[in-house]
Amino acid sequence: MTAFFVEGLPAPQGSKTGFIRGGRVILKESSDKVKPWREAVSKVADGVLMDGPIHVEMVFVMPRTKAMGDKEAPLMIQRPDIDKLTRSTFDGLTGTAYHDDSQVVSMTVIKRRAEPGEPTGAHIKLSPASVGLLRRLISWAFKL
């Protein structure tokens, strides 16, 4: 098991924008924030490189709005979408924390606003996955 915090602004990986240059199709990220986020994730995760099936837990800590002041933040239902945050982060982990994101067989992901004074980023925990772990997760989630 390994856990770490990636400080920065988590960036969602959306669709790519395509254009033609010199007769070739070029695909570009729709947001310029994705590349710096993936690089920050790769830098922090460098040297972990796990083999086999993996369970991932991630908590994305997003910026507070000015209107929140020091009040407790409500559950975050605004953009960015949690699946797009996960996609960009998994790409940053590929080749540094694991060989390929196909190794991820289960995950728990949370998106929330930062507490007052808390930095934005992502708490990431990677654990070896087992059949027993998956059975416990399924049993807990679906009360089987």
Predicted regions and their residues:
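Acidic, proline/glycine-enriched N-terminal capping motif
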Residues: M1-L144
